[in-house]
Amino acid sequence: MDLLSPLSAIVLTYREVDTDTLGKIGEEMRKCLEQMGRGTPIYVLHTCGRVEAYLYGASPEEVQTVAETYRKYVNSVRIIAGVEAARHLFRVAAGLDSMLIGETDVLGQLEEAFDRQVRAGYTRGLLKTIVERAVRVGKRVRTETAISRGPRGLGSLSIIYVSRLLDMRQAKVAVLGAGAVGAGLAMELAARGVKKLYILNRTLEKAKEVAAKTGGEARPLTKEEVERCLRECDVVFSSVHSMEYIIDKIPEGASVKVVVDLGVPQTVASGLPVKVVRIEDLREIAEQYNAERASEIAKAEAIVEEELAILPKLLARRYIEETVSTFIETAMLAAEEEGARAGCNTATLAARTTVKRILLPLVERLKKMAEDGQIEEAVKLAQMLSQTIGRKI
């Protein structure tokens, strides 16, 4: 039984469309998540460079329904399945599919989305195991190779870009947004010794957390505070997610000289009387660092393939755990019923103990079979046991 075959991925990246289109599709996918609820397990990754949806056990019709969400804005999307879908996710986590090869921001964004969607009940079961493993792959690649040495992501590249325009040590800087990208920006700006640092976020507590780590000042992300930052600061970085412009005008007499827009879709209006830096402006710098990191790509790809080879065994073990937990629960209920019939707590305890003694060694044996490569046999036996005891998974 191939436990990767039920995995599907709908993929669209910065290579195919502009960041504004990605932002609009990302918002549509947020609504799609809510509509799907807790039906088919799903995981959506939306960053400044991609919108990807991973489904497990979805019917062809469900996959096409999700793909149609993309097709509202683009003519075609890439749909991949099975081991190729897992390979793609692992490569994304490793930073191998990014504009800046080896970037670390994407791993933080992947983890943020994963934690949020697991809590909401969207990402679960074997899909949860696959995404968890992708996170591990991303961390392992960055630990065992030098692919992430230097700029950590597009935020880092934007700081390099701006530092070529003015002296950052003499600059007052504001960061709008305290998520993975915004927090990374703040940490790096603090390390560069900017004159003054402000962190704005819709949730003020989150801004305070980042400010405490960077020596910055936390402010709420409101229209008034954004305007205040434009008046006081030399540079403003926007890393927030918004379907409306966060900055649509520059107040008269403002000090701001450069505005950096890392939002998807764009959060800074065009035609402003200051220098506006967008994601597309960072490609040339990214290519320079990609050339430096090229020698590490093969090492990272080897780790991805090594982890892919392990994945089927991990999924089999997890599948067996989920399956047997259900039939053990059924057996325990039967034991309690027999104990209740006997009218004795001791009899109930004895029955439960007997169930454990009989079934737990079987469970461990099935797990060992999966680890030894007898995946199909172990899965079939687990299914047979489940069906025999009366609960089919």
Curated annotation (Swiss-Prot):
GO terms for molecular function: glutamyl-tRNA reductase activity; NADP binding. The keyword NADP applies. The record marks 88 as: Important for activity. Keywords: NADP, Oxidoreductase, Porphyrin biosynthesis. Its EC number is 1.2.1.70. Pathway: Porphyrin-containing compound metabolism; protoporphyrin-IX biosynthesis; 5-aminolevulinate from L-glutamyl-tRNA(Glu): step 1/2. It is an enzyme of class 1 (oxidoreductase). NADP(+) binds at residues 177-182. One of its GO terms (biological process) is protoporphyrinogen IX biosynthetic process from glutamate. The keyword Oxidoreductase applies. The active site is at residue 48. It catalyses: (S)-4-amino-5-oxopentanoate + tRNA(Glu) + NADP(+) = L-glutamyl-tRNA(Glu) + NADPH + H(+). HAMAP family: Glu_tRNA_reductase. Possesses an unusual extended V-shaped dimeric structure with each monomer consisting of three distinct domains arranged along a curved 'spinal' alpha-helix. The N-terminal catalytic domain specifically recognizes the glutamate moiety of the substrate. The second domain is the NADPH-binding domain, and the third C-terminal domain is responsible for dimerization. Belongs to the glutamyl-tRNA reductase family. Homodimer. During catalysis, the active site Cys acts as a nucleophile attacking the alpha-carbonyl group of tRNA-bound glutamate with the formation of a thioester intermediate between enzyme and glutamate, and the concomitant release of tRNA(Glu). The thioester intermediate is finally reduced by direct hydride transfer from NADPH, to form the product GSA. This is Glutamyl-tRNA reductase. It comes from Pyrobaculum islandicum (strain DSM 4184 / JCM 9189 / GEO3).
